[in-house]
Structure formats: C-alpha cells, structure tokens
Swiss-Prot record:
Known cofactor(s): pyridoxal 5'-phosphate
Pathway named in the protein's UniProt entry: Amino-acid biosynthesis; D-alanine biosynthesis; D-alanine from L-alanine: step 1/1
GO biological process, one term: D-alanine biosynthetic process
Catalysed reactions, as listed in the record: L-alanine = D-alanine
Record organism: Lactobacillus acidophilus (strain ATCC 700396 / NCK56 / N2 / NCFM)
UniProt name for this protein: Alanine racemase
Length: 376
C-alpha cells in the first residue's frame, strides 16, 4: 500500500526503547553466546531496516527473517552481518541467497538435492542451517534416517557450508515444561546424529532465553522481546526473570478529523449497530480496517485528548467513530495504542480485546500507516 503521509495517522516507534531491550538481553547472554535479532514481518510491524541498524550498533551477531525478500531488503540497506531465512525458500532461489550471502533453512533432504542442482550450475556455495522439527510440526527434519542421509550428502559437498542447526520451541513460555523438555530431548538426539559440524547450534527464542537460562545454545534468536513485549500470554511469566526489563516501543496515533452531534435514534456506521439513545457527540478518526485496525475493535476504548472513549459503530475501511464525552476540536490527538503498559489501551489490552496475541496486533498495522521514529 501507499503510505498515507498526508493523513494524520502513524505508527510511532521509540528506537531508544528498542535499544534498551536489546542491551538488556545482551547482558543476559552466557559468555561466548551471541544474539540474532529477529526482524521478520517488518520487525513485527516496527520497521525492519531501522530496527536492524539499532541491533547492529548494540552488537547483534546477525538477523533472522522469514522470507528471502526480507533478507534482500536488509542487504539493499547496507546491512552486512549474517542473515538467516527461517522459512522455506524454493531451491531455485538458492543462487540468489548465495550471491547475497544470505543463509537458508534446510527443511528436508529433498530440498538439499534440488538446491544443489541450481548452485552447481553457477558454481556457488550456500550457507545453510539444518532445521529440526523437534515437536513444532512445522518444517525441518524429524526422522533419523533422513537426517543421517542428509549429513552424508553434505560431507565434502562444495555447494554447501553448514553454518547452523536449529529448532523452535512450541511452549517455552508455558508453566508446564513437559512438552518443552520433550522437544529439547528430541533436538539433542538429532544433534547427536550430526557428522557435519555447524558453526552455530541454536534453539533459544525470546521465551527460552528469558525463562530457561539453563539451555545451552550458541545463539539466542531474540524476537518479540526486542519490541518490549512479553513472549508469554501468561501475566505471571513476567516474574520468571525480573532482571530483564521489557519496554514497549510502539504506539499508534491519529487525531479527530470531524466532530458532530447526532440525535436520539440516529445510527452510526454500516448496519447502524450503534443507535444514539440521546444527543451524542461523535468524533471521526481517519483509520480503518484497511490499515489493520480490524472491525473486531468496535467498542475498544481509545484515548482522545485525556479521555478514554469507546469506538462506536462498525469500523469502516478507512475511518472509525468514537463517542465523545464533550465537544472536542478537530485535530485533538487520538492514541489508539499506547506504548505505556499501564495504560488501558496498551497493545496487550488491544490483543486481549479481540482474543488474539500482541504479535498479531503489531503485525496487522500495515504500510499505509507511516512509521515515525524517535529516540527517547
């Protein structure tokens, strides 16, 4: 989408908070342990290039993305540190990754054989990380025989440099550690089958790095914590490691573009799901579901000036309406999502309201909303 620079609505990102979150995690790394900053999905909606530059300054060893194009975006922005694509990239694009020094995930043996053909044609070597499905049920090796066969294939194979081996935990943030332990056991078993020697072995995501300090991993893949958000939906989990302070970086702001009084019996928005029972002051905000502010947020309270006001009527594609307690001037500031975790319209509260997780709310805020960066 085209960013709406001439519309009073934007996502604001405090790079100072991002910096402090990264620094706090760096302090908790084990001696010799390194950090990969996860900046996939436009850095969870915060802006991949800007976040990556801060992470480079702080000392991140490299970056994780989800698709090859995200890695290429970083390279085009002169990011030179290692980049790992966590998702599956078609083998035919392996040469593009190799030329741009981007590491790819190997999901299975068949992928290796196909990628080798494309790399051999151009006499290229690709850096790879062996993905292990230890219980996520997503991508990666999960059978011993196939993994052993892949290892033999990689021995003395000039088309590949085995840079890493990794898995992803499904429940590192859960109070019940049984499945976490099952996954760790499975990963360690697969690691014992290695005949090639990766530079990096990594299993720790944000949740594992915060809640499971006993995990031995060359790298920590630090993701949601960069943005100051708790990796767990369990509020008590924030106390599992009180030394790590997470400071939310994102706020979502707009302003009133229209204010009017409607009368008893008047409806608001499509379907007239809100009908005034008395004279009511309505304010219009130029943000809608086309920006990622979905219709389920009807009823959620946003901050208009210094008052919390409910969204009334259905959220439109490009606008939504709020019920105001008093006449307010056009141009009054509207904080849709606050970066203050104590405010009732913080991102966790927004996620709870629509029965999802804050990861999704942040990622929903799309490119039509300009990102404004500041350091505080």
């Amino acid at each position: 989408m085209v960013p709406g620079y001439h519309r009073p609505a934007a996502v604001k990102v405090n790079l100072g908070a991002i910096r402090r979150n990264l620094e706090n995690e760096m302090k908790h790394l084990d001696p010799g342990q390194k950090m990969l900053a996860v900046v996939k999905a436009n850095a969870y909606g915060h802006g991949a290039v800007e976040v990556a530059k801060v992470a480079e300054e702080v000392g991140a060893a490299g970056f994780c993305v989800a698709v090859l194009d995200e890695g290429l975006q970083l390279r085009h922005a002169d990011i030179v540190k290692p980049i790992l694509v966590l998702g599956v990239v078609s083998p035919k694009y392996a040469p593009i990754a190799a030329v741009n020094n981007i590491s790819l995930t190997v999901p299975n043996f068949e992928w290796l054989k196909e990628a080798e053909k494309y790399l051999a044609k151009e006499n290229l070597q690709l850096k790879i990380h062996l993905g292990i499905d230890s219980g996520m049920g997503r991508i990666g090796f999960n059978e011993d025989d196939e993994f052993i066969e892949a290892n033999k294939f990689l021995e003395n194979n000039d088309q590949f440099f085995v840079e890493g081996m990794f898995a992803h935990f499904a429940s590192a943030d859960s109070a019940d550690e049984s499945y976490f332990e099952h996954q760790l056991e499975k990963f360690n078993h697969m690691k014992s089958l290695l005949t090639v020697k990766p530079k990096w072995i990594h299993v720790s995501n944000t949740a594992a790095s915060i809640f499971h300090k006993n995990i031995k991993s060359d790298l920590v893949r630090f993701g949601i914590g960069i943005y100051g958000l708790n990796p767990s939906s369990n509020p008590a989990s924030a106390d599992l490691n009180p030394d790590i302070k997470l400071e939310p970086a994102l706020s979502f702001e707009s302003e009133l573009t229209h204010v009017k009084t409607i009368h008893k019996g008047d409806g608001v928005s499509y379907g007239s799901t809100f009908v005034a029972d008395k004279d009511t002051i309505i304010g219009t905000v130029p943000v809608g579901y086309a920006d990622g502010w979905i219709r389920k947020f009807q009823g959620f309270k946003v901050k208009v000036g210094d008052k919390y006001c409910p969204i009334v009527g259905r959220i439109c594609m490009d606008q939504f309406m709020v019920e105001l307690p008093e006449k307010m001037p056009v141009g009054t500031k509207v904080v849709i999502i606050s970066n203050n975790p104590d405010d009732p319209n913080n991102i966790k509260a927004a996620a709870d309201y629509v029965n999802t997780i804050h990861y999704e709310v942040a990622c929903l805020l799309n490119d039509r909303l300009p990102r404004i960066y500041y350091e505080k």
